[in-house]
Amino acid sequence: MTKKRKHQEDFQKVKLKVGKKKPKLENATDTTFKTKAIQIPEQLKEDGMLTTQNRKLNIKDLLSQMHHYSPGVKQNALLGLKDLLSQYPFLIDAHLSNIISEVAAVFTDKDSGVRGAAVHLLQFLASKIRAEQIAPFFPLVSAHLSSAMTHISEGIQEDSLKVLDILLEAYPALLTDRSSILLKNFVELISHQQLSKRLKSKEKLSWMLSVNPNRRVTSQQWRLNVLIRLKKFLQAVVDGSNETEDEGLQEQKDSPHSVRNPIFISWKVHANNQQHIHLYENGGLRPKMSSSFRLRSLASVMDSAEKGLSSAENLKGFIEIIIPLLIECWIEASPAQSAPILGNLLESDCQQLMQQVLSIIHLLWKLTKRHDETYKMEVWLRMNYLVDFKHHFMRNFPYSLQETVKHKKKDSCKGNKYCTTSSNNVDHLLLNLTLCDIMVSLASASTLQADSGWLDMIRNFVTDTLQDGSRLNSKQVNRLLGVTWRLMQIQQNKVATEPLIKAVYTLYQQRNLLFPVRTLLLKFFSRVYQKEDSKTQRIRSRSKVLSRWLAGLPQQLALLGLRNPELSNQLIDIIHSAASRSNKELLQSLQATAVQIYDPLGGTLVLLPAEAQRRLVQLVYFLPCLPTSLLACLSRCCIMGRMSSELAATLIGILRMRSSFAGWKCQVQDNAVNDVDYFSFLFSTLIGFSREELTSLQGIRGKPHISQTQLSPVRLYLTDLDQFLHHWAVTEVICHSLSTIPSQSQCFDILQTGICKYLVGLVVIPDSTAGSVLCAINKLLDQACILSENLHKFLASCCYSLLYFLLTLDKEDAEHVQKRDMLWGSCISALALLPRLLRLMLQSLQVSRICREELPVVAQLLRLLMQHGQLRSHMMTNEFLVQQIIKDIMTLKSGEVQEQWLTDLHYCFNIYLASHPQGPSPMNAVY
C-alpha cells in the first residue's frame, strides 16, 4: 500500500447505518445531570424599598434618567422621584447631594413641563429638608437659580420666580447671604443697561426699563411680579438683621443692641444664700453674649462685594440703580396728568405696582438705618431723592382705588370722601401710609421750614385717618403710628403734637378694637408719656389728652378682668410705670378704682395669673391712701387662697411699710394706713374667716367636717389641707408683723380684745383659726401681758379640742395628718408659756361626764403631757389634779380587767410625778 493511501485511512469517516447508535469512546465524559425548579416569589426587600409604586425603578435609575435627552423621560423621572421620596422619606438624607444637584440642574431646562415638575419636587423637598442640611449645597442651588433668572428664555425666567418663592419661604437666611448676586439679577429682569457713546466711564452706566413683547404677560404685570419677589427678598434681609424695630415705635436706646432681662429677687431666699444676684450682664459663670457681631472663620472672610446690603457702599450702589427704575415704574402706573383731581383714582393693577414700589423703598430706608453713620445716610438720601419724590409721589397725594360703582342712587358717593373701597387685596390706605413713612424719614427739625408744605399734607392726612373711625388692621395702625411719632419728633411744640395725640386717642376710644391694634396704641401712648416725663420740669408741658388717657387706664383694667390677660398685663405695666413716677392723675384714678381691682370675689387681682398678681400687689405701695374698705378686700384676698401665700406675705409687708410701724428713721411719706385699720387688717387676716363665714359654720354638725368632745365647749371645723397650709403660712407672716410693733403689751391687749369680741362664745371654730390664735399668743406674750379670764377659758378649750383631734386622728387620713406637727407645737408652746392655761385644761377634764370610749384618749393625753420636757414642772405643780383625774378614771374602770393604756398611765405617773425626779428629763413625747 502506498504512503498516500495509508494517509487517507487515518482521516476516513466512519459511515454509520440508520438506527445504529454511535459507539462511545473510551475516554468519553458522562454529562448527564438532574435539576429542580427554584421559585422566587419576590425580590429582596432592600431592593424593593428602593422602587416606586409602578415602574420598579430605584432612586439611582431615576436620577440617571434626569440626563436623558427626552423631556418626557425627565419629567416622568421627576414625578417618580417625588412619589418615591414621599413613600420613603429616609432616602432624602441618604442621597441628598445627588437629589439637590440633579433637581437644581433642570431649573434651566428648555421644556416647561420638566421645569414645572422640578418646581413641584422642590416644594416637596423644602418641607422635608432643614436649613442646616441644605446649607452645604445651597451655593449650587443659588448658582442654578441665578442662571435661570438671567436666562435668555422668557419661560425660564418666569419659572425662576417660582423657585425663588419656595427658597424665600423655606430658607430666607441662606438666600439673603448671597444677596450681592441676586439683587443684580432682579435689576436685569426688568431693565437693561443703557449704552451711550457719551458715557466715557463704564462705572456710570445707567439702567432703563426693558419691554419684551414675547412674554405671555404685559410688561407692567411682569415688573409687578418681579417687584413682589424683590420686596419679599428685601424683607428677608431686614428680618435677618440682628437689630429689630417696630416701625418706629421702639424707643431709641443708648445701645441699640442692649437686651433687658429683668431679675425677680426673693429676699427671703437670698438671705438664706439660696439665690445669687448678678447685677451685670457677664456676672455669672458663663458670660451672656449680647452683641451685634458674629464671628466667622478666616476661610469665610468676605470682601465688600460679597457683603451684600450689609455694606453701606453696596447699599448706596443698589439704591442708585433701583430707585430710578422704581420711579419709572411709578410714572407708568401713576394717574394721567389730565385725569380729574378728585380722589386721584387708581386702577387696581396700577395701585398694586405702586404699592410694591413704595414698599421696596421703605425697606431700603430701613436698611439705611442699620448702619453706623445713619445721619450721613439720611442727608445723602434727602439730597439725591427728595426732589424726585416730591415731584412724582406727592403730586397726587393721597391716592385711592378706582372701582366700578353701580349707581343705584344719585347720592351714593356723598358720604365717602374718595367714593372707593378696597378690593382684590388692595389696600390704598397702606399705600398712602407707606408714602408718608418714606417722606417723613427725609425730614427733620432743621428742615421744618423748607418742608412745611408737604409735611402739612401728611399731617392732615394722618389726622383725618385717625379720626375717620373706620376699622383699621394692625399693619395699617402700625405704619400710621410710626408716621405720627416721626411727625411729633420733627415738630415738638405742643401746638403741633396735641392734635396728633388727640387723633390717636379718638381711635383708642373706639370699641371692639382688635387686640394687636389695642396693643400698638398702648405702646404708642406709653412711649409718648415716657418721652414727655423724661423732660425737665422747666420745659415739661403736660398733654391734657395724655393725662386723660392715663386716668382711664385703671378703670379699663377693672372692666377687662380675665377677658384678655395679655392686654391686662400691658395695662398693668403702663400703670405701674406711671405710678412709680407719681403721676397725679393716674394715682387719683387708681385710688378710685382700687376696690374694684382688688375685689376678692371677681376683681382683677384674683382673676389674673400669678405674675400679673405680683405686679398688682406692688401697685398697692403707690396708692395715696388705704381706706377701710380697701383693706377689707385685701384681707379677703390674702385668706381666700386665690393668690399664693408668698404673694400674700409680700402684700402684708407692703402694708406694714405704709403704716406708722414701718420703723423709718425719717418721715419719707405720710402714713397711708390708719393704725386702727391696720390692726383690723392684721386681725382679720389672722382669723382667716369673715364674720359671715364663722356664723354659717355654727350650724354644721357631725363628721367628717366636725371634731367634737364632751369635755370642751369648742368644736373644730376641719379645713382642707390646702386651705390650712395657706392660712398657716399667712399666720406666720402676720405674727412677724405683730412682733415688730414697738409696744407689745398694747398690741397684745388689742389682740385679746378682738379674740374676746369675735371668737369667744362661738361653738364651732376652724382648726386653722384655733391654731393661728395660739400661734399669735405665743409670739406676743411677755411678762407685761395680762390675760383675761374669758381668754384663758377659751384658749384652754381650744387646746383640749385640738389635742383631742390630734390624738383621735386616723393615721391613714393623709390630709389631716400633715397638720399634726404645727397644731401640736402651738398647743404645747401655749401650755408651757401659760401655766394657768394648763391648770384650766386639767380642771376641765371631768371624766365623769364623758363616755367610756373617750377615757383612753384622756389617759394618753395625760401620759404625753407628763412625758413632755417643757411641761414637766407645770405638771408637777398640778400633781394633785392629775392624781384626782387618774383616781376618777380608776373609779370608772373598777371591777373590770385593767387594760394596757391604764397600766401605762399608772407607770408614767409613778415615774414622772409620784417619785418627784430631780431635774427635767430630756425625753420628748413621741406618738
Swiss-Prot record:
Keywords: Nucleus. Its main location: nucleus. It is found in: Nucleus, Nucleoplasm; Nucleus, Nucleolus. This is Testis-expressed protein 10 homolog. Component of the PELP1 complex involved in the nucleolar steps of 28S rRNA maturation and the subsequent nucleoplasmic transit of the pre-60S ribosomal subunit. Belongs to the IPI1/TEX10 family. The keyword Nucleus applies. HEAT repeats lie at residues 99-137. Disulfide bonds: none annotated. Gene3D superfamilies: Leucine-rich Repeat Variant (1.25.10.10). The gene is TEX10.
